[in-house]
UniProtKB/Swiss-Prot annotation:
Signal peptide: none annotated. Belongs to the metallo-dependent hydrolases superfamily. Adenine deaminase family. This is Adenine deaminase. The lineage of its organism: Bacteria, Bacillati, Bacillota, Clostridia, Moorellales. GO terms for molecular function: adenine deaminase activity. It catalyses: adenine + H2O + H(+) = hypoxanthine + NH4(+). SUPFAM superfamilies: Composite domain of metallo-dependent hydrolases, Metallo-dependent hydrolases. It comes from Moorella thermoacetica (strain ATCC 39073 / JCM 9320).
Amino acid sequence: MLPTRRPLAEVTRELVAVATGKLPADTVIKGGKVVNVFTGEILPWDIAIKNGRIASVGDVSAAVGPETEVIDASGYYLCPGFMDGHVHVESSMVTVTQFARAVLPGGTTAIFMDPHEIANVLGMDGVKLMVDEGRELPLKVFATMPSCVPAAPGFEDAGASFGPEEVAAAMQWPGICGLGEMMNFPGVLAGDPAVHGELRATLAAGKPITGHFAMPADFQGLAGYTAAGISSCHESTRTEDALNRLRLGMYAMMREGSAWHDIKATIKSLTETRVDSRRAMLVSDDTHPETLLSTGHLNHVVRRAIEEGLNPIRAIQAVTINTAECFGVAQDLGAIAPGRYADILFLKDLARVAIDKVMVDGRVVAAGGRLLVDLPAVAYPDRVRHSVHLKEPLTPWHFRINAPAGKSRVQVRVMEIIEANVNTRHLTVTVPVVDGQVTAGVEADLAKVAVVERHGGNGSIGLGFVRGFGFKAGAVASTVAHDSHNLLIVGMNDADMALAGNTLAGCGGGMVAVRDGQVLALLPLPIAGLMSDRPVEEVAARLAAVHRAWQELGCRLVSPFMTMALLSLPVLPELRLTNRGLVDTLQFKMVDLITG
């Protein structure tokens, strides 16, 4: 049974009594070397804990009573628990509970999640589901209210639509700590009334607005974006991007996840300059299940920053006090200091981020990489498990692309993927016509793409072509398709594309690979078609099987799943496909597939 977490206002008298020697502590940690994130010092402090919070530090011998648990921390560095300031839990493909099970042993004790993936499928109900689930966990789960649902109104159909009214309502919910990443930076700069209505509702609630400004060359645009009250941004990919954010007073979130490896460049904003690092944050953004198992979570991100030359204490500040101050929770979190929750990591080696024990609310919850506490079981309602609503079963006919009469060859627009890069190239390619149909082709490395509306709406299907996956046969499909998470199918023949799509509709969503009418591998993700409630180890194993099946079909990409999932996100350059058709994202307009 996990202890009840009590607000500071309810325990002030007890904390003061322990600090002044009038009341014994519940727990005392002795002999450790405390990382002081306020001053950057390492101090030989003992720590007294009462009611899950730190009552005092330094010489706390007066707080030791006959019932006090004394923990010997000799040989350990002690630092605050790590806090992820920007994470999409859904990207891990597991629920909040299973995510907590995976990351707590590695030292992550708090997250600030942006649940905009589930919001696009289940709306406010989905956001509330994840927030409520997080309240029952030792991991401290905060959420920012998704701001861009859908990501590109008018170009796609999602399962919900948010505006100022929804944002204002969510700001009153417990656990909502701010506004999620404002991807509609053109709307911010153009003065879009709905966008600024969301900003106004958040600022009126006294909560921060997190950013997503993806125009690195536009400093004046970034300045205008910041003037709207947006206080952080994780879209730095170059040294100068991070520096510009720091210089404008933003929190520069530097990310290292499964698909984004930005720290090598962005950390130079700190290591090659003399700028103050207290507005720098280290975040994960998107981390897949196999990454959580193989390299870890924030422990890996901090380690990478140190490997690139950042002082270990500055790296720790970037996942503790800096994060807490960004979100206005520094009175409770982010430091080993009186009044704060006793979320404490025991490290054998600071530079290697060698975490041996993890304490949350004054209780050791993990040791030696293993979780020591049971997490509550969660029952998900049927509406969450059955979120794939196709207008009708798919047939090969749905994927036919008719050529203009009399044509033997046509020119078509093609999305060309760039490995390890979120962008696509907008190409025009000449392709053959067979029996009146525009066809995919192995020789040209062209696969057909379909985005099928799956939220019970109009059932529309957008069709296009993609180059770069290397498929020789078969088809793959996924309901993880940013950000509206419609049913995304890529294939070399229409029959296999239909089978792939229908397979996912039958299991509530997930990822699948098929060939010649047979399912090669399937990862069910029944929670909104995005997540599994199975342990991360099981999900990672099934995901690996899907990856092997992709390789059997000819794909040689290192990280193909995120590459595919972004094909349908119409806010990224240069060409994307939604259920409504092709979007030229540089001109922000719908375009025809066949050009001549």
